[in-house]
């Protein structure tokens, strides 16, 4: 039996920990912010010093931006964190598995201590940060493929030896201490990582996120709508995000698509509605030509399952994505999705088979996708195919088996 210590954001790894435990892996999770009462989830000590560490990282970024808030929370430099190597959970583990460790959780120096402990390390990438200098998504910038500098996330493009350059060089040195087995959640992210100069000669495996298919599954649509007082006779499109107005979530393209649909299909004005859940969801009521049903951001997973089951389509106009859990959740509930051709989205949605992959940043094609799904005569088959895709690729047992293979491989190598 392998004892494992998972380190990172609880939201990213809680389901994965449960699936590993169900497959014979003894797992403990170290988190900064604990959201459950599970004893296998251990919260790192929280005090004024931890708050100061988080603030200090932001102050350094703020000063690099000439004391402007420019991209202040879009980058991380991991200059502060918590040393976990003396904790019993660390000492008892055979494998250390890092996940999303930013914003004051682990510093690069803390990771160096983990690497020099001699324990094998797996690091699941939830974005590009491990393979770039300071950014989580490089967008059009390719500097990380040779060496980060003149960073577009720094005010006026930084400079030749800016914060991105200095952090990139620190990561280069860090990765030389001991092997790290990197895991990406999508083929797209694996391709990006393998082009990085930081990952030259590094092991990278692609393993998708897992989903609890016993929880996320098709249910009675009429009953689901009744729980949120949604109308029975309308076609409903769902859009959701932690922060609705976040430009990266592409809400402007959804607004554009809906306006095009209203122009081309005026008969839809009374037969189509948009369910919006997330913080600031009310702001869309004045901007969409269809009736909007705003819901707050919901954390309770059982309620989230009901929301998916209440709608006919999930729209995700995001401009940056790895392997979005919300697509997985919607498809598991039998809800076809429309998303842009970006990141890992086209790996999840099979175009015209279980959903629609729209041309990047095209409101017109996004509108085409919404129209195609809502008018598809074989909608029930489309829905069934969405379910099958998740069951065949993202179920907990399938993903846990892939991770178990990685653990067995690296513990054997280090034995």
Describe the residue ranges of each PLM region:
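Conserved donor-binding/catalytic core segment of Leloir-type glycosyltransferases
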Residues: 231-249, 255-259
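Single conserved hydrophobic/aromatic residue that forms the stacking wall/gate
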Residues: 1-7
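Short alpha-helical donor nucleotide-sugar binding micro-motif in glycosyltransferases
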Residues: 306-311
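Conserved acidic donor-binding segment of nucleotide-sugar-dependent glycosyltransferases
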Residues: 351-352, 356-363, 372-377
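A short, well-ordered alpha-helix in the C-terminal region of glycosyltransferases
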Residues: 365, 378-393, 402-405
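Aromatic "clamp/platform" in nucleotide-sugar-dependent glycosyltransferases that forms part
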Residues: 319
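Nucleotide-activated donor-binding/catalytic signature segment of Leloir-type glycosyltransferases, i.e.
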Residues: 265-271, 276-305
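Short hydrophobic beta-strand element within catalytic cores of glycosyltransferases
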Residues: 336-339
């Amino acid at each position: 039996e392998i004892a494992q210590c998972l380190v990172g954001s609880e939201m990213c790894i809680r389901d994965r920990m449960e699936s590993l435990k169900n497959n014979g892996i003894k797992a403990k999770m170290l988190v900064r912010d604990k959201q459950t009462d599970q004893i296998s989830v251990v919260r790192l000590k929280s005090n004024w010093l931890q708050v100061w560490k988080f603030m200090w990282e932001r102050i350094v970024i703020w000063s690099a931006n000439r004391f402007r808030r420019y991209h202040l929370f879009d980058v991380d430099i991991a200059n502060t964190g918590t040393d976990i190597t003396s904790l019993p959970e660390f000492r008892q583990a055979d494998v250390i598995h890092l996940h999303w460790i930013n914003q004051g959780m682990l510093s690069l120096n803390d990771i160096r201590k983990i690497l020099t402990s001699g324990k094998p390390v797996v690091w699941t990438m939830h974005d590009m940060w491990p393979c770039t200098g300071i950014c989580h998504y490089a967008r059009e910038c390719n500097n990380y493929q040779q060496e980060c500098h003149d960073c577009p996330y720094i005010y006026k493009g930084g400079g030749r030896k800016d914060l991105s350059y200095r952090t990139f060089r620190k990561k280069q040195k860090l990765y030389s201490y001991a092997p790290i087995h990197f895991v990406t959640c999508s083929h797209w992210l694996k391709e990006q990582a393998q082009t990085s100069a930081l990952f030259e000669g590094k092991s990278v495996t692609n393993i998708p996120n897992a989903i609890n298919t016993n929880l996320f599954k098709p249910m009675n649509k009429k009953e689901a709508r009744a729980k949120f007082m949604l109308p029975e006779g309308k076609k409903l499109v769902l859009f959701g995000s932690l922060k609705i107005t976040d430009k990266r979530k592409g809400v402007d393209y959804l607004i554009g698509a809906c306006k095009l649909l209203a122009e081309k299909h005026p008969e839809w004005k009374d037969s189509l509605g948009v369910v919006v859940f997330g913080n600031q969801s009310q702001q869309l009521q004045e901007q969409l030509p269809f009736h909007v049903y705003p819901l707050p951001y919901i954390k309770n997973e059982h309620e989230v399952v009901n929301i998916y089951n209440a709608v006919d389509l999930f729209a995700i106009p995001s401009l940056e994505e790895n392997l979005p859990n919300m697509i997985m959740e919607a498809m598991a509930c039998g809800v076809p999705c429309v998303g842009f051709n970006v990141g890992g989205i086209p790996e999840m949605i099979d175009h015209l088979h279980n959903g629609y992959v729209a041309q990047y940043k095209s409101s017109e094609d996004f509108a085409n996708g919404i129209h195609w799904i809502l008018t598809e005569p074989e909608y029930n088959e489309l829905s069934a195919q969405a379910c099958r895709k998740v069951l065949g690729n993202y179920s907990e047992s399938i993903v846990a088996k892939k991770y178990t293979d990685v653990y067995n491989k690296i513990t054997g190598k280090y034995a």
